[in-house]
Each structure stands twice: as C-alpha cells, then as structure tokens.
C-alpha cells in the first residue's frame, strides 16, 4: 500500500456527507415507484426470510429457509432496520437504497481521488444508471453491500491507510464471502509489484511483508463465521446442495472457459455497457487533450494495475465458482471499469460530456428494453414485470380458488406459502415441481389428484426473437453447464396436465398463467356448494 500510486488523500475525504445525501435523495426519487413491490426471486427464497428469522429469534442461522453459510452482515443490518422501523417492502427497499448510496459515495471518493471531480461526477451518474446497479439498488441481495465496502476499502488502500482498508475489506467479506477476493488480489499484487520493480530479492523486503501480512487480516472474521456456522449446522460452506451447485458442479474446464466468456461480456458489453467501453477504446486512438501546456492527467498506471488486478481476480474467481453466472456478482468491480472508461473519455475527447450523456441514454435504454437473448430479469426492470405478474396471479388465485391446492415451482411456491413476502394474505397448499419443462410436468401429470390448479410462469426469460436460436449447439451447452431449460407454453402444459388455461397475462417477455385441472372442475360442477359468483 503506497501513496506513490498517484492517489491524493488530502482531497478525498471532503464533502462526502453531501454526496451521500444527494445520492440517496436521487436514488429514492428514481426508485419511488418500485419501493412497494413484493420481494423477488432470491429475496423471497432466502435473504428476506433469513433476515426475518434473525429479527424474530436473534439467531443468525435461519430456520425458515436453508442455511447457505452466507455471512450475516446484511441480514443483521436489515433485522436492526426493521426493529427500529417497520417490516414492509418499502421500508426494506429504502434500507437497501442507503447501501446503494454508500456505494455511490465510495465511487465518488475513489474517482475523485485517482482522477478529478468531473470524472467522479460522471462516473457516479453512469454507475447509478447502469441497469444492473440500478435494479440491484432496491433488491435484498448481498452484492451491493459487498460493492460498497470494497470500493471504500480500495480508496483507503490507495491512500496507504492500511487499517481502514483492512477493516472495510473485512466488512465486505462479512457482507458476502466472495468479496474476500479483493484483498487476496491486492496481497498477490503487493508480492508481485516489487518483483516487477526490483527483482525477486524485493519479495522479502519489510514493506512487502508488512502489506502482505495486513491483507490477510480480512479473512479472519470470515473464517470465524464459517467455523461458527460449521459448529451450529455441521457444514462449513452451507448445505450440501448449495455446495454442489456452486462449487463441485462448476469445476469443469469447458464450463470455466464458457463462464469466463460470459464474465468478460458482463464487464465490457452487458446491458449496453459496450457503448461506454467501445467509446473508450476508440478514444485511445486520439491524442491526449491539453490543459494549458500540459496534457490532461490520466489515472496513474499503478492505480490502473491495482484496478486490473482486482477486476481480473473477480472475473477469474466467478468463472470457477458459482452455479448461477449473474452480473450482480461483479458489482464490486463494474464501477472500476466505468471509472477507467470515463477517465479515458475525459482525457482524450473534447466533447466528452456528450459522449457520457449518450452512454447514460444507452443505460436507460437497457433498463427499459430487454436484450434479444435470455438474461436474468434482476438485471433491469424486467424484475418489476415479473413481480407485478406474480402479485396479480396470487390475487387471482385468492379470489377464485382460495382453498385450492396449487401446483407451481419455486419461487412461486414460497410466494404462495409465506404471506410475509407480500403476495398473499393467507398461505396456499402448494405442490412443488422443479420447473415447467416437459419432464417435471409429465411427472406431475401422473398424479393430478394432489392439486386443483397450476400456477405456471416464465422461469427463464425467452425473447420472441432470440439471437441464440441461430446457434442450436449453444442451447445444449447452456442446458449442460448452466441449468438452462425451456418452459412449456401454458397451452402445452394444460394439455399435458389435463386442464385448461383460465387466466394468463404477459409483460415484455415475462408471462404467468393459471391452469384449472379438469378433474377439479368436474368436482366443482357436481358439488352442491359450488359458488359461481366467487371472484
């Protein structure tokens, strides 16, 4: 850790409270229409129930959902927030906006520190509007907190404020265990940098040993958590299925290569990020602009190497580990890519603010327009469409079939059985299937006596025009390595289950449908208590 990197610590600590307040205010205004949405996907499936368990019992090991060994910092924060306020989606999402504002303040601090205030403001605006960051700003996931503490930790690292950096990296790892990769990458960089500068003899120097020893420290609180989790549950890294899905099933050379390609796309092109990265790449062909008789200052090469080490370490780690290749896992380093590109534009393009405005317009477009290939709805406002459809489906079931047994898949199985998630007032009896592809539904069709209606929905986003349809082998690869499947259409599912579609709705590629099983319909027709006016 050295100030020779080009960081300017004297300026970085000024005016950050107003930056945080302004960031939160603008985020709150932009996200106001989303604050009351019920909980979505992994929120509903794990993170909200885990935090709710902690609120009610004080125990960091959840009981209403499986423990997957994620560190408890975010759930502790939410439990305290609910205890001081209210347990509602709006309250929860406001709390997550505070975390997002903290992350943006860290982006501003870091960018102003290594570049200048103009680059800092532009980087913050681009980051806030980048679809993945925008969508994640109100969602109860761990990645935003990990990003916030990692970015602040990097800022202090570049100022050579070792203990502050170590503390923040430790908090990042307690927010999400994968965040430990940042201090590990910096530790390796501290060992390699002297070799590059002065040869192998420098590895044993006192400064190198001191920095390396301190950068191990963020792992200690995380290790203590894993030991505590193992003592309580018998598993160090979570339940066996969680470990299989995220570790043992991913250690295939071809899968690692394919995941690496997807991670590269996430870092340079995903959700219209290519508008910024391509613009910066083209700008590199231009000479630096001059301020007076001096060329505009670039981000110090040493700082760029630090950023590169952390970015590459994150991409490599997430190519090897993690069953779901989600863009939000890269939130701690995506702002670094944005910062490097914005700084390049400012240094070489005279009308760079207009280019940044074009980039922001592209990001807004990415929020509103889905890409022509399958993607995770949580990466833009498609998650809003999903939640609205599922809430309307739950309302329909409550009005028409309040006592029905419902065949469905996760996470709707949780949405219908846990009123605390915001979809229904009273729990339904649910029969769960893995998904709505042909094999699980064929198995369900052999025992239609166990359910009365089926709630089907798009478990995988399928655009009407899918670019990957031009590559049939790509779908086979996705099925083999990335848990991909195609859902049956509601009509095909109804024929297989022996029922009929009684309600269906669709929004921008997301759909939901209710199928009434003919056996249940016949029972109603012959029942003296049938109430045809129940709506």
Say what each PLM segment does.
Residues 20-21, 215-219, 273-279, 288-311, ...:
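Signature aromatic-anchored transmembrane alpha helix within multi-pass, membrane-resident enzymes
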Residues 3-5, 11, 181-219, 287-293:
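Perimembrane helix-loop-helix junctions
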Residues 104-106, 126-130, 145-164, 168, ...:
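Specific aromatic-rich, kink-prone transmembrane helix
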Residues 20, 94-114:
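Transmembrane-helix motifs of polytopic, lipid-linked glycan transferases
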Residues 40, 96, 132-143, 326:
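Short acidic/glycine- and proline-prone juxtamembrane loop motifs at membrane-interface regions
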Residues 137, 143, 172-175, 181-182, ...:
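Hydrophobic/aromatic-rich transmembrane helices and adjacent perimembrane loops
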């Amino acid at each position: 850790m050295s100030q020779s990197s080009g960081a300017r610590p004297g300026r970085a600590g000024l005016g950050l409270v107003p930056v945080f307040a302004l960031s939160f205010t603008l985020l709150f205004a932009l996200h106001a229409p989303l604050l009351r949405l019920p909980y979505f996907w992994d929120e509903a499936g794990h993170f909200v129930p885990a935090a709710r368990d902690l609120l009610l019992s004080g125990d960091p090991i959840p009981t209403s959902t499986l423990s997957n060994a994620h560190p408890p910092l975010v759930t502790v924060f939410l439990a305290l927030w609910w205890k001081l306020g209210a347990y509602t989606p709006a309250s929860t999402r406001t709390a997550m906006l505070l975390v997002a504002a903290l992350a943006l303040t860290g982006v501003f601090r870091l960018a102003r520190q290594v570049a200048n205030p103009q680059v800092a403001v532009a980087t913050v605006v681009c980051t806030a509007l980048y679809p993945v960051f925008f969508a994640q700003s109100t969602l109860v996931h761990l990645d935003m907190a990990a990003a916030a503490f990692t970015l602040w930790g990097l800022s202090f690292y570049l100022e050579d404020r070792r203990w502050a950096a170590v503390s923040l990296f430790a908090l990042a790892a307690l927010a999400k265990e994968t965040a430990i990769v940042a201090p590990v990458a910096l530790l390796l960089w501290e060992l390699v940098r002297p070799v590059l500068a002065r040869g192998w003899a420098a590895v044993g120097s006192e400064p190198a040993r001191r920095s390396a020893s301190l950068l191990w420290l963020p792992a200690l609180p995380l290790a203590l958590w894993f030991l505590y989790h193992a003592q309580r549950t018998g598993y160090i890294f979570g339940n066996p299925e969680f470990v299989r899905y995220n570790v043992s099933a991913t250690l295939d050379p071809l899968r690692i290569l394919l995941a690496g390609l997807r991670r590269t796309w996430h870092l340079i092109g995903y959700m219209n990020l290519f508008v910024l990265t391509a613009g910066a790449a083209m700008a590199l062909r231009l000479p630096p602009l001059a301020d007076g008789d001096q060329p505009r200052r670039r981000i110090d090469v040493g700082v760029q190497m630090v950023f590169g080490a952390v970015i590459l370490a994150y991409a490599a780690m997430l190519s090897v580990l993690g069953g779901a290749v989600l863009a939000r896992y890269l939130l701690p380093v995506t702002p670094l890519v944005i910062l490097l590109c914005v700084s390049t534009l400012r240094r070489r393009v005279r009308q760079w603010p207009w280019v940044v405005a074009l980039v922001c317009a592209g990001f807004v477009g990415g929020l509103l327009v889905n890409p022509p290939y399958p993607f995770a709805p949580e990466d833009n406002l498609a998650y809003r469409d999903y939640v609205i459809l599922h809430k309307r489906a739950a309302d329909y079931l409550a009005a028409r079939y309040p006592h029905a047994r419902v065949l469905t898949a996760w996470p709707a199985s949780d949405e219908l059985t846990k009123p605390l998630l915001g979809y229904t007032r009273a729990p339904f009896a649910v029969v769960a299937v893995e998904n709505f592809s042909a094999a699980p539904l064929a198995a369900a069709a052999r025992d239609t006596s166990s359910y009365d209606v089926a709630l089907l929905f798009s478990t995988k986003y399928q655009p009407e025009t899918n670019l990957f349809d031009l590559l049939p082998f790509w779908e086979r690869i996705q099925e083999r390595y990335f848990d991909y499947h195609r859902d049956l259409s509601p009509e095909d599912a109804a024929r297989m289950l022996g029922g009929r579609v009684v309600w269906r709705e669709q929004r921008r590629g997301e759909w939901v449908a209710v199928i009434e099983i003919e056996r249940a319909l016949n029972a109603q027709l012959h029942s003296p208590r049938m109430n045809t006016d129940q709506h």
